[in-house]
UniProtKB/Swiss-Prot annotation:
It comes from Neisseria gonorrhoeae (strain ATCC 700825 / FA 1090). GO terms for cellular component: cytosolic large ribosomal subunit. Disulfide bonds: none annotated. This is Large ribosomal subunit protein bL17. Part of the 50S ribosomal subunit. Contacts protein L32. One of its GO terms (biological process) is translation. The keyword Ribosomal protein applies. Belongs to the bacterial ribosomal protein bL17 family. PROSITE patterns: RIBOSOMAL_L17. PANTHER family: LARGE RIBOSOMAL SUBUNIT PROTEIN BL17M, RIBOSOMAL PROTEIN L17. Signal peptide: none annotated. Keywords: Ribonucleoprotein, Ribosomal protein.
Length: 122
C-alpha cells in the first residue's frame, strides 16, 4: 500500500530526481517562466515555494540554506535581492501552474510554470 507517500517518483532514481528538480527550480527562478510536463510542474512547485519563503528572510543562515538547495550563486543573489522583497506581502502561493496542451512527440500533458507577481513584459 502506498498510503501517504509524499513525492512523485517520475520514473527516476532519487539522485536523478533531486538533480532534475534542482535544475528546474534554478531555471524557474532565473527565467520566471518555464514549460514542462504536468507531473514535473506539480512536483516543482513543492520545491520552489519554500525557496521563495526562505528568500524573504534576509539572514546569512537563510542564504546558506538557499545555496545548499540550489548550488547556484546567481540564483541565490536573485532570490534574496529581487524575488524575496517582491513577495513580502504574499503568504505562499508564489508559483502558478497552468495546463499548456500536449507535447507533439508523445502527447504528454504540458504545463506552464510561472511566478505569480511577474513584472509585465515590455
Amino acid at each position: 500500500m502506498r498510503h501517504r507517500n509524499g513525492n512523485r517518483k517520475l520514473n527516476r532514481t532519487s539522485s536523478h530526481r533531486a538533480a532534475m528538480l534542482r535544475n528546474m527550480a534554478n531555471s524557474l527562478l532565473t527565467h520566471e517562466t518555464i514549460v514542462t510536463t504536468l507531473p514535473k510542474a506539480k512536483e516543482l512547485r513543492r520545491v520552489v515555494e519554500p525557496l521563495i519563503t526562505l528568500g524573504k528572510k534576509p539572514s546569512l543562515a537563510s542564504r546558506r540554506l538557499a545555496f545548499d538547495r540550489t548550488r547556484d550563486r546567481d540564483v541565490v543573489v536573485k532570490l534574496f535581492g529581487d524575488l524575496g522583497p517582491r513577495f513580502t506581502a504574499r503568504n505562499g502561493g508564489y508559483v502558478r501552474v497552468l495546463k499548456y496542451g500536449f507535447r507533439k512527440g508523445d502527447n504528454a500533458p504540458l504545463a506552464l510554470v510561472e511566478l505569480v507577481d511577474k513584472p509585465a513584459a515590455e
